[in-house]
UniProtKB/Swiss-Prot annotation:
Organism the protein comes from: Chromobacterium violaceum (strain ATCC 12472 / DSM 30191 / JCM 1249 / CCUG 213 / NBRC 12614 / NCIMB 9131 / NCTC 9757 / MK)
GO MF: lipid-A-disaccharide synthase activity; phospholipid binding
UniProt-recorded name of the protein: Lipid-A-disaccharide synthase
Pathway: Bacterial outer membrane biogenesis; LPS lipid A biosynthesis
EC number: 2.4.1.182
Assigned protein family: Belongs to the LpxB family.
Reactions catalysed according to its record: a lipid X + a UDP-2-N,3-O-bis[(3R)-3-hydroxyacyl]-alpha-D-glucosamine = a lipid A disaccharide + UDP + H(+)
Length: 386
C-alpha cells in the first residue's frame, strides 16, 4: 500500500463523493506542510487524481439505510477487516477517517487500540440524533475535526479533543457566483429555464430518486417547453447507472445534459435545484441557488430513523439556519407533482428566492474558515504527539 521509504504515511478512508472532496482538499494542505508524504486507503476520483492509492473502489462503501446496508454488510465487514489488518502491518503515521462513521469508527477503534493515531474528519450528526455517540467516538479516535460551529462544545463536554475547522466549500465557492458567466461556460442559453437535478452520490440513492426526478422533469417540461436539465454525477459508476436508467424509464427524449463532476458549475448555472438530502444541499446553499430538498428511504429504514431524529428538518441548510428556509419533500411527499410545484414556485416567486439567498449568504459567512489548513495542522499535531 505504502511504497516510499521515509515519507510520512497517511492512511485515509473517504466513503462517498462528499468525503472525496474533503479529503482531496486536506491532501493538498498536508502537502503544503510536508512534501515527503504518501496517501493510501480507500478514496474517490479527486483523491486518486492527487496520487492516492485506493485499495478498493470508493463506491463499495457508498451504501445508505439500514435495510440496504444489511445486504452489503458481509462485503463491507470483509473490506474493513482486510484494511485494518493491512494498516496494522504497515503502521501509517496517522489514520484519517473522513465521514462514513458506520464504517470508519469501528476501523478507527481497532487502529487506535493497535497504537496508530486516529483522526475523525466530519462529526456525525450527534446534535440531531444519537447524541450518545460522542462517547463512542471519543473512545475510537484521538481527535475530531468538526465542520459546523455547534459541534465542538458537545465533544469538549465529553473530554474529547476537537478542532473546529469550518467547511472547505465556504472558502472554495465565491460569495456571489456569476450565473450568466457559468451558463456561457457551459454553452447554455441565457433566456431559458435551467433546472439542475441531483439524485445523489450513492448508487442506492439513484435507484430511489432518479425515477421520481425524471417524472418531475417531464412535468416541468410541460410548463416550460424550452427548459434545460443538468444532472451532475460524481463517479463513472453513477454515470453509467444513470444512463441505464434513462433507457429503463424511457427518458432519452428529455433535454438532459449529464456532467461528470462539475456539480458546482451545474448549481451556479441553474434557476432552481432539486437535490437529494445530504452534503450536496449545503453546496447548493453556498452557491445561493433556490432549491427543493427531497429524500426517499425504504419504509423500514425511514421508521427506524424517524424515531431517533431530534430535529424537525433533515436538510443541512435548514439545520444550520435553525428554520425551514428550504422546502423538504420526503417519503410520501416526494412525488413528481409536489416536487414540480415547489420548483415552479421558486422559479416564479422572487421574494422566496431573495429570502433564501439572504439566509444562504449569512450561512456562508459563518462557515468560511481556512478549513483545509486548520485540519492539516491538527492532523500533523496528532501524528507528532502520538
Amino acid at each position: 500500500m505504502f511504497k516510499r521509504k521515509g515519507a510520512l504515511k497517511v492512511a485515509m478512508v473517504a466513503g462517498e463523493a462528499s468525503g472525496d472532496l474533503l479529503a482531496a482538499h486536506l491532501m493538498d494542505a498536508l502537502r503544503a506542510h510536508r512534501s515527503d508524504i504518501e496517501f493510501a486507503g480507500i478514496g474517490g476520483p479527486r483523491m486518486e487524481a492527487r496520487g492516492f492509492h485506493s485499495m478498493v473502489p470508493q463506491e463499495k462503501l457508498a451504501v445508505r439505510g439500514y435495510s440496504e446496508v444489511l445486504k452489503s454488510l458481509p462485503e463491507l465487514l470483509k473490506i474493513r477487516r482486510r484494511l485494518r489488518e493491512q494498516l496494522l502491518e504497515e503502521r501509517p503515521d496517522v489514520f484519517i477517517g473522513v465521514d462514513a462513521p458506520d464504517f470508519n469508527l469501528g476501523l478507527e477503534a481497532g487502529l487506535k487500540k493497535g497504537g496508530i493515531p486516529t483522526v475523525h474528519y466530519v462529526s456525525p450528526s450527534v446534535w440531531a440524533w444519537r447524541p450518545e455517540r460522542v462517547q463512542k467516538i471519543g473512545r475510537a479516535v484521538n481527535h475530531v475535526l468538526c465542520l459546523f460551529p455547534m459541534e465542538p462544545p458537545l465533544y469538549r463536554q465529553a473530554g474529547v479533543p476537537v478542532t473546529y475547522v469550518g467547511h472547505p466549500l465556504a472558502s472554495e465557492i465565491p460569495l456571489e457566483p456569476d450565473r450568466e458567466a457559468m451558463r456561457d461556460q457551459l454553452g447554455l442559453p441565457q433566456g431559458v429555464p435551467v433546472f439542475t437535478l441531483m439524485p445523489g452520490s450513492r448508487q442506492s440513492e439513484l435507484e430511489y430518486m432518479v425515477p421520481i426526478y425524471l417524472d418531475t422533469a417531464r412535468l416541468l417540461l410541460r410548463q416550460y417547453p424550452e427548459a434545460q436539465f443538468l444532472v451532475p454525477l460524481a463517479t463513472r459508476a453513477t454515470m453509467d447507472q444513470f444512463e441505464q436508467m434513462l433507457y429503463r424509464f424511457k427518458a432519452r427524449d428529455l433535454p438532459i445534459r449529464k456532467l461528470f463532476g462539475h456539480a458546482q458549475m451545474a448549481m451556479i448555472a441553474s434557476d432552481v435545484v432539486l437535490v437529494t438530502s445530504g452534503t450536496a444541499t449545503l453546496e447548493v446553499a453556498l452557491t445561493k441557488r433556490p432549491m427543493v430538498i427531497s429524500y426517499k428511504l425504504s419504509a423500514l429504514t425511514y421508521r427506524l430513523v424517524k424515531r431517533k431524529i431530534k430535529l424537525p428538518y433533515v436538510g443541512l441548510p435548514n439545520i444550520l439556519c435553525g428554520r425551514f428556509v428550504v422546502p423538504e419533500l420526503l417519503q410520501k411527499q416526494a412525488t413528481p407533482q409536489k416536487l414540480a410545484e415547489e420548483m415552479q414556485r421558486l422559479y416564479t416567486d422572487s421574494a422566496a428566492r431573495a429570502d433564501m439567498e439572504k439566509a444562504f449568504t449569512e450561512l456562508h459567512l459563518a462557515l468560511k474558515q481556512d478549513t483545509a489548513t486548520r485540519a492539516a495542522r491538527a492532523v500533523l499535531e496528532v501524528a507528532r504527539c502520538h
